[in-house]
Every structure is written in C-alpha cells, then in structure tokens.
C-alpha cells in the first residue's frame, strides 16, 4: 500500500498539468479539476481521476494544489472546496496571486476549515522546466504541519526553499518575476537593435555566450525570437498581472522601469499579444507590427 499522500490538483493549465503529470509518474494518486473540462483528459490514461467539480476532486485529498489564474479565481474556488475538504488536509496555493489575496485566502480557510494547513507555495519557473520537474518551490507557512506536502513538492520540482510565515513566498516570487520581466524587456529591445543593425538573434547569442550576460533564459528567449515561435511558457497577460502585483507592493517611485514596462505590455496585450509568450513583446516592438 502506498504511503504517499493523495493529491488533488485544481487548475490544469500549463503548470497544473505539468504538476499532475509528474505526480502520476512518481506514483501518487491524483485527482484533478479544471474549468475547461477538456484539460487533463490526456492524463486520464496515466491514472488521473478527472472530476466535474472542485469539490469532488478534493473529497479524498490529503494535499491540495491550487494553480489558478489569479486571486479572484483562487478565492472563489477555495470558498467552494473548503467545506468538502478533509479536516486535516494541506492546502498548497501555488499560483502568483499577490499578498492581499493571500491574506484573504488564509483568513477564509481559517474560517471555513480551521484544522487545515495553508501553505503558500508559488514557484520559480515556467512551463518547460515544470514539465521536467525543474522548477523551484518557494514555500512559506507551518512547515511541520505541512510535512505531507514535502514529497509532493519533491516530485514536481528540483527543490523547495522555505521563507517563514505564509505569504512571504508570494513576496519573493514577485521579486523574482520583477527581475524576469525586466530581463525580458531588455532581451526584446537588444534583439530589436541587433536586427536594425543587421545581426540575427543567433549572432547576438554568440556574442553573449560564455560571458556574464549569457543566462540560459536569454538563450531560450532568443531562440523563440529567432524562430518567431511564441508558444506560451508564460503568457504575457500573466506576466503583466505579476508586474502590477509587484508594483502594488513597492515603495512609490522605486521601480520606474517596471512601471514603464507594465504600460508597454498593456499596449501589447491590447494589440492581441496577451495570450502569447511574454517574448512576443519583441514582435510587438517591431515597426511592422504598428504599420
């Protein structure tokens, strides 16, 4: 008999789907739910129990992963599932929903299921590393009470870092995403300048490779730019949401660069790039896109 905890995954988008897949590969019993029922059907052949409602998905779960689009969706679903959860279950909120929404979710769970444990656990990484279990889990909350979640995190990640009380890891995730967003804007602008001056993205990477600026992320995004394939690893709309969450926590006037990027990316989203990978901002910057 397996000693692994039973897991429910709520939200089977790019990240939730990867989590469920890796859990199944590691022998976990996994139930899943998604607003769009077709998501996750491919995992049923590998053992996923797909449910029509989130309440059904969590009924037997000892560890619940929530990976929903934003704070509003997270709070809505949490209110629905809490009465249906096992009293001692561990609720792992793994989306980037911001600090006020995290505090609301903690209070809501405490009100509806006071014996449950809330673990705040956003991740560093996007779709491709998630599929390879190479993300980093940024966890916060009562680690002792949340011990049953640790083998779950181990199955979906390269490791877990703990940051004290629940909510602290939301803060760290927004710090990391502010850096990522700023980096992506720099990559896109540098690639545009290179193009104007007659260089390809591959030539730009060759000049960077081996030096201090040659981060693997830069290579991945320059490859996307070179191929003009912007299949979302992280949707521009989601990155824009995270930029705004980061700005909401910053001291006034301390992040003028990110403020400008958020304004630009809103224009890109309005121009039809919201569902593309955030690297599609390169394409939006092209003079031809504004012709």
Residue ranges and their predicted role:
Residues 214-278:
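Interdomain hinge/lid region at the active-site interface
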Residues 97-177:
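Rossmann-fold dinucleotide-binding core
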